[in-house]
Design a protein with these regions (language model features):
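Gram-negative and organellar
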Residues: 1-353
Length: 353
């Protein structure tokens, strides 16, 4: 029962709270549709699929590229990919630059990643992608380092209102301990984000992804990395303070659906006798809290060019708590001998945050 109520409150048409209000004091003809909607479930909100992607890397040029699709089998699928260039400003320089152009899936929720359907009404929406560019400059002299980055993206999905994102961040870190096979760093990081529109919700027309109008985060990150002859691992953590400010938003992003809901709310208000109202908007909110993250990754050389690796992570670095994990097996066609990388460079899915 709890799961059904939670789902009805998050997805699709009239939610459970609205329906209870309407049906508690029914207005006959105008509420017949609401009655029908509330009598049925929204359908299962889960999905599965198989992602496909190919990638190319030329380390001597600092060039990387990939092309693929969001998982086939999802309700909504899209082409995704990107290209990046990471090089020093001059040979043997401590200064570097990174340029990245990409189209990526927004994986904050099932709605934003795979899309959703309300079985009561038949409406489908979601499957959001972010297309944009990002640039970074950095300095590292093996005693300390600093970086500055900026990015812009346009976000779109099926029957989802378009949005734009701007981000800016910087940080500094120090090598607290460093030798050939181990390294400890600590520092400070500051990041900021702005979205034109609050698309954080799950009703029809919303994207279901974190999209505050103001987001600021100040963190204290630490990282420990170590390697042996055939293994390498890294543990990372960060704790700090974050501030989130989100505008209020209409219950539906579709103008026709929102207009119909507002008309129904006005009719209810004119006839209700208990003083209750039918909400048609999500409330604005601002909050400050503690942000944290913890992650670990590692890789083992099995021999004959094969490597086994994995990664785990948890964080509340936005407005939700997230747990991630992955395991991979990769094969290198080139010579796989020599020292293991420090820090480890685990495989990253094109769909990872």
């Amino acid at each position: 029962v709890h799961e059904a109520a939670s789902s009805n409150a998050r997805f699709g048409g009239f939610n459970a709270a609205q329906g209870e209000l309407l049906l508690a004091e029914p207005l006959a003809e105008q509420l017949s549709d609401a009655d029908a909607l509330m009598s049925d479930g929204i359908g299962k909100q889960k999905d599965r699929g198989v992602g496909l992607a190919v990638a190319y890397e030329k380390p001597s040029l600092g060039l990387k590229g990939d092309l693929g699709s969001t998982p086939l089998g999802f309700r909504e699928t899209s082409l995704v990919g990107g290209i990046s260039l990471d090089r020093p400003f001059a040979e043997n320089s401590n200064f570097r630059y990174n340029l990245n152009l990409s189209r990526r899936a927004v994986v904050d929720s099932l709605l934003s990643f795979a899309g959703a359907k309300d079985a009561r009404t038949g409406v489908e929406w979601g499957g959001v992608t972010a297309s944009g560019l990002r640039g970074q400059i950095s300095f590292d002299n093996q005693r300390y380092g600093t970086y500055l980055y900026a990015g812009w993206a346009s976000l779109d999905g099926k029957n989802v209102e378009s949005n734009e994102r701007v981000e800016l961040g910087s940080g500094i870190y120090w090598y607290l301990f460093s030798n050939e096979d181990a390294r400890l760093t600590g520092g400070l990081s500051l990041s900021a984000q702005h979205y034109d529109d609050n698309q954080s919700f799950y009703t029809y027309g919303h994207g279901g992804y974190f999209s505050p109008q103001s987001f600021f985060s100040l963190g204290v990150p630490f990282s420990w990395a170590q390697r042996g002859a055939n293994w390498s691992y890294q543990v990372q953590s960060s704790v700090g303070v974050q501030y989130i400010d989100q505008d209020g938003a209409p219950y539906y992003r579709d103008k026709g659906a929102q207009s119909a809901l507002e008309s129904l709310a006005a009719t209810y208000a004119a006839n209700a006798t208990d003083g209750r109202v039918l909400n048609t908007r999500y409330a604005a909110q601002s909050k400050t809290g503690i942000g944290y993250s913890l992650g670990a990754s590692g890789e083992v050389r099995l021999g004959d060019g094969f490597f086994l690796g994995g990664a785990l992570g948890m964080d509340n670095a936005r407005d939700y708590r997230q747990y991630t994990g992955g395991l991979y097996l990769r094969y290198l066609f080139d010579d796989a001998g020599g020292a293991m990388p420090l820090p480890v460079n685990p495989y990253r899915s094109p769909y990872s945050n």
